[in-house]
Amino acid sequence: MSVKKEIFGIHPSGKEVYKFEIVNKQGMKAVITNFGAILISLFVKDKKGNFQDVVLGYDSLEEYLDNHPMFGATVGRNVNRISNAKFELDGKTYLLDKNRGNHNIHSDKEHGFHKVIWDFEITGENSVCLSYLSCDMEQGFPGEVYIKMTYTLTETNGLILSYFATPNKRTILNVTNHTYFNLGENIFSTEFCIHAKSFTPVDEDIIPTGEIREVKNTPMDLTKYSYIGDRLNSNYHQLQIEKGYDHNYVLDHPHTGFRLIAQTRSMKSGIHMDVYSDMPGMQFYTSNSLKNTIGKNGVVYKKYDAFCMEPDYFPNAINTKGFEKPIFDSNKNFISTTMYQFY
């Protein structure tokens, strides 16, 4: 096991940006940059013994400076949607960037966690710890927040993402990673299983309605391994809104801590991925908005070429009655762990 550091590029501010390669004894390799705490590449062995890069991304720092799809991004302070780009906390109204119609998505797509240079520390032969101090009212959110995000590659082919954030006063924190996975060709050759009996339906703006609906007898039911290609053309309204999945699943056993929440496998490559988390929800997204984006090695990424599995608190939870609020303060840190296990 080893960690290699090298310069990835020069930021417009003049600062050097680095990338880190972590390789285990099986040859699995994770490539991370301290710009945006982004996962650039993840090389996993397929059924033929060859290593495939199973995540979408770019070749250069310059391309990540834009990164509209948010490939591999650490998203914060708040992932997903906030209706009308505002929320109330302790009697005060906070206004956010209206970056998706009248609403807010992923906090600030131009100045979020994925667009800043993080400090770094190589904390062992298999992990890199990235840290960032977010100032009071940055992105429109109250409170100063010091966050650490650690990538760890295990000898058993697991990639662990650990988050620890400390605010100095009450604020919203809902941090996740926005990696696009491609285990083999596209989502049509991949089977999915999500350990959730319910999901949160959305309106035409992809804002949860507040309902928690059972997946049973709907195309949203992924409680058993399923191919989803034929479902994308169904007349089920929730899938017609964006012509794909972009929904929060209400995970089973939400208060039992770190647990298996989802599984995927590609018969084409033979690669399996299990997802573990301690979060109550997970956003499942089938790259509905990808439009001929040129990525690594000149590959053109198209709609449905990849999927995201983003453990988190429910979208728009701060504004929705009955949803657990992602509110933290100096006496309550944001702590979360996600693991992507490959075999």
Language model features by range: what are they?
Residues 1-343:
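An exposed, glycine/acidic-rich loop-and-rim segment of catalytic or binding clefts
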